[in-house]
């Protein structure tokens, strides 16, 4: 008994510390931001962090949400599917009930189950694979970007109606995102009676694509669409140019990385890429663009504005119904939001009812122009 009495002050002190910690935690609303911070796709994570942090800082400067500041929790997922569940679990363990979640589709497809099971409201500003929301039809998970079954047909329509090639090759990286969007393009081209002479996967990480380039030459294609990320496309562009294959290349938003010019060199000139429309030009976004620039962040990229919009939607929803994730998710499913990407409405699966893609052209210096 004396031993227990000696512990009582310690126990009381520990209890006081725990209560103080809980009180401190309750002073903020945590938002997990799991993104690629390492690996070859860090630029996508940088863009999403830039958008999310700018929105958080803007909202906090105006007093936060219901008197509480938003607290960003930065987590690295490496754009690696094997890191998906560990990264999502770090969001859970941080105490965050909300997340601006994951740039890469392969990661998101695996991680979305964690958010659904734990009741965490997640919004991805970057993952376009239909599998994200088709696999389990989540209630707690949403997007602020379109799907590949929107992006793929959009690209195919541009190819068929504007570029009008004689023969097309559709290549992909055999991964969730790349093969998915490539299949969407192939199927949409077939519906428009465009001749897809070659549909084939390449291996991620290979350094020599001479074999597939030889096949492209033999097939006599005049346009190559590649589904995947920039490292492989960069090598395909450079090696095709070096081996005398001068055809039009096109890809999805996952290829639109400034590191592409360092890999492809001058062969990047003329590359076409589908990306979200330039939301910096939307009427009413002048103050958002200024907030980016005041924070010395670039608003001009594929994912900055979708990430900014994700935070806006979370903040507006919490302000309306409180911090209960179930109520926030219910509110998001039935509400129209005014955001940095325009009006946002969700369907039953958390997909956007409308999203605008556009085609951009790259010059030899890696600068892009919306067509």
Predicted segments, located by residue:
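N-terminal signal peptide c-region/cleavage motif recognized by signal peptidases
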Residues: 20-22
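Extracytosolic ligand-binding ectodomains
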Residues: 2-15, 25-371
């Amino acid at each position: 008994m004396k031993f227990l009495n000696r512990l009582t002050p310690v126990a009381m002190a520990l209890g006081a510390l725990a209560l103080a910690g809980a009180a401190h935690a309750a002073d903020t609303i945590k938002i997990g931001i799991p993104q690629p911070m390492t690996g070859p796709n860090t630029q996508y994570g940088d863009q999403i962090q830039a958008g999310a942090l700018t929105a958080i800082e803007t909202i906090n400067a105006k007093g936060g949400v219901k008197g509480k500041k938003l607290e960003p929790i930065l987590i690295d997922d490496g754009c690696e599917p094997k890191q998906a569940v560990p990264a999502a679990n770090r969001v859970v363990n941080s105490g965050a009930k909300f997340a601006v979640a994951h740039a890469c589709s392969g990661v998101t497809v695996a991680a979305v189950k964690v958010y659904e099971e734990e009741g965490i409201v997640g919004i991805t500003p970057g993952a376009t694979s239909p599998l994200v929301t088709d696999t389990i039809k989540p209630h707690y998970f949403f997007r602020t970007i379109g799907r590949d079954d929107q992006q793929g047909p959009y690209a195919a329509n541009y190819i068929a109606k504007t570029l009008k090639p004689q023969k097309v090759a559709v290549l992909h990286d055999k991964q969730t995102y790349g093969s998915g969007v490539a299949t969407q393009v192939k199927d949409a081209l077939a519906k428009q009676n465009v001749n897809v002479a070659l549909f084939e996967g390449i291996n991620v990480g290979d350094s020599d694509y001479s074999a597939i380039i030889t096949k492209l030459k033999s097939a006599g294609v005049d346009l190559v669409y590649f589904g995947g990320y920039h490292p492989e496309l960069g090598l395909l562009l450079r090696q095709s140019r070096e081996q005398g294959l001068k055809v039009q290349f096109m890809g999805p938003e996952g290829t639109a990385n400034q590191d592409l010019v360092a890999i492809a060199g001058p062969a990047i000139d003329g590359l076409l890429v589908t990306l979200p429309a330039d939301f910096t030009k939307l009427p009413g976004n002048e103050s958002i663009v200024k907030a980016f620039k005041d924070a010395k962040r670039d608003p001009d990229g594929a994912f900055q504005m979708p990430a900014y919009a994700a935070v806006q939607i979370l903040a507006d929803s919490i302000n309306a119904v409180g911090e209960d994730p179930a109520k926030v998710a219910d509110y998001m499913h039935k509400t129209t939001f005014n955001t940095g990407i325009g009006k946002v409405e969700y369907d039953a699966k958390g997909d956007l009812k409308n999203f605008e893609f556009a085609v951009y052209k790259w010059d030899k210096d890696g600068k892009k122009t919306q067509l």
